[in-house]
């Protein structure tokens, strides 16, 4: 994409792999100074070093987004290092253990909600505190196809992703007149380490069936989500806020 983020600062959570890493690379290649945040410190450092070796300005931060103190420290480190925060992609997320609603556990509920919903809330809270000081900024939250439809044995994950859309719309209303735009992306079936985990867990056939139900008849690439995120964060989307953009090969239009 021919979008420039020169002299801008971008923060990406879940940046050690998958959608987060692809988006961090895209921001860097578009000229942004990029903060890569993830709980996996080793892989985050490696990703940041990969970009730095190509001449990009990067910062690696270890952050568990379910920990408010770590999220606050992440945003403070971003600002103390680069002076501001212009764009944020709140991408960190995990899957739930497959189970009917009656068989789910409180432990799994708390674990998934802590990262996928509370984590997004916490990131937005501290990002917005900085952005309202500046009077500008853009945030993109990672929801999912699961934020638009139901999913058997995935109730916790889908509930969290529905919640992300609710937070996105509410915060967008609060900040629309203050120079801050907030949107969400809803990825469909994208080949990422999370998809690899599903195959390893014996869900390979389910993935194949999902692929067959995609009108475009293929699995998406992480870079296609990164393109959507960068567009939403750019001036090209200056009149877009509170939206949940599906990037799913047409799955939800069936």
Annotated model-derived regions:
Residues 124, 160, 168:
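Active-site helix of classical SDR
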Residues 129, 173-177, 238:
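Alpha-helical segment proximal to the catalytic Tyr-Lys
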Residues 82, 121, 128, 136, ...:
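C-terminal substrate-recognition "lid" of short-chain dehydrogenase/reductases
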Residues 99-101, 105-111, 206, 210:
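Substrate-binding pocket helix/loop in short-chain dehydrogenase/reductase
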Residues 144:
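Residue(s) in the substrate-gating loop at a strand-loop-helix junction
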Residues 176, 181, 186, 240-242:
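Short, small/polar-rich loop/turn modules that mediate ligand/substrate recognition or access, typified
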Residues 2-4, 95-98, 149, 230, ...:
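Short C-terminal tail/terminal secondary-structure segment
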